[in-house]
UniProtKB/Swiss-Prot annotation:
It holds the Pfam family Fer4_9. Binds 3 [4Fe-4S] cluster. Changing P25A: No change in activity. One of its GO terms (cellular component) is cytoplasm. This is Ferredoxin-type protein NapF. It comes from the Bacteria. Its main location: cytoplasm. Gene3D superfamilies: 3.30.70.20. GO terms for molecular function: 4 iron, 4 sulfur cluster binding; metal ion binding. Signal peptide: none annotated. It is found in: Cytoplasm. Belongs to the NapF family. Coiled coil: none annotated.
Amino acid sequence: MKIDASRRGILTGRWRKASNGIRPPWSGDESHFLTHCTRCDACINACENNILQRGAGGYPSVNFKNNECSFCYACAQACPESLFSPRHTRAWDLQFTIGDACLAYQSVECRRCQDSCEPMAIIFRPTLSGIYQPQLNSQLCNGCGACAASCPVSAITAEYLHAH
């Protein structure tokens, strides 16, 4: 009996559209990116901070778990398909959210996200309980992900600000 390997995608969920990941900086419109990306891994291999990995469908996806984006533009320069926007444009429209797992919300003193945030988009304000609570200023945030990388409980997540 011969097995059709192309049909295995139904069992593994690969038939779904390969989206819901954060694409590399300057990758632009997701539908254009997914249509023209050859999944060659050139951008993944060029990433100096190792935040790019193969995501759904083998497309490059950002993972802020261990590091931040330095906006070095190496991923864009490595792409043989010229899919990336010019460096002088905004890298991406990401919105970071501090979730309920945040240690400060659990009455545990922690300010690692603030300490790692170079543009100082995260500040801690006093509360009646005595534990300072984080506030994220999205106007100051550059989307580097340093806060998410430094969070010991992975309470900080990123998503696109606008439909991508």
